């Protein structure tokens, strides 16, 4: 809880039924990757990757703005929670880049590509928390 990362914090809000409070306009765009896609990527690199090389893992097929993720989570929760914009002057902990693009070409040449769409991953995660 409250680990400061947008996905974990927003998901906790959604599961707890508390409003998502945006600390910025939410214009930053990220390429979230579902855990099974990330694990598959690690296994592919472990088995087929070049020794001592690095590979970017991200779902570059679906870059999404932070505010869009917040709205999707509100929708998943049946609109029981609201997305509230309360910009703070001190955004020192946030990345200043609107878009951080990761080139996934190298890992894709090994045969990896993301399989889980962001919406499906968010629904799966939400449902797994609700089922607990």
Question: Where are the regions that the model predicts?
Answer:
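Flexible, glycine-rich beta-alpha linker
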Residues: 1-7, 29
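C-terminal substrate-binding subdomain of Rossmann-fold SDR/epimerase-dehydratase oxidoreductases
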Residues: 14-132
């Amino acid at each position: 809880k409250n680990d400061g990362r947008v996905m974990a914090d927003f998901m906790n809000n959604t599961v707890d039924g508390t409003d998502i409070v945006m600390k910025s306009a939410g214009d930053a765009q990220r390429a979230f990757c579902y855990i099974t896609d990330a694990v598959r990527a690690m296994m592919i690199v472990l088995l087929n990757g070049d020794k001592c090389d690095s590979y970017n893992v991200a779902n570059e097929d679906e870059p999404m703005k932070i505010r869009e993720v917040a709205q999707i989570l509100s929708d998943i929760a049946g609109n029981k929670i609201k997305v509230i914009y309360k910009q703070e002057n001190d955004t020192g902990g946030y990345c200043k880049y609107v878009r951080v693009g990761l080139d996934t070409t190298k890992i894709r040449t090994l045969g990896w590509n993301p399989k889980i769409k962001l919406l499906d991953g968010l629904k799966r995660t939400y449902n797994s928390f609700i089922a607990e």
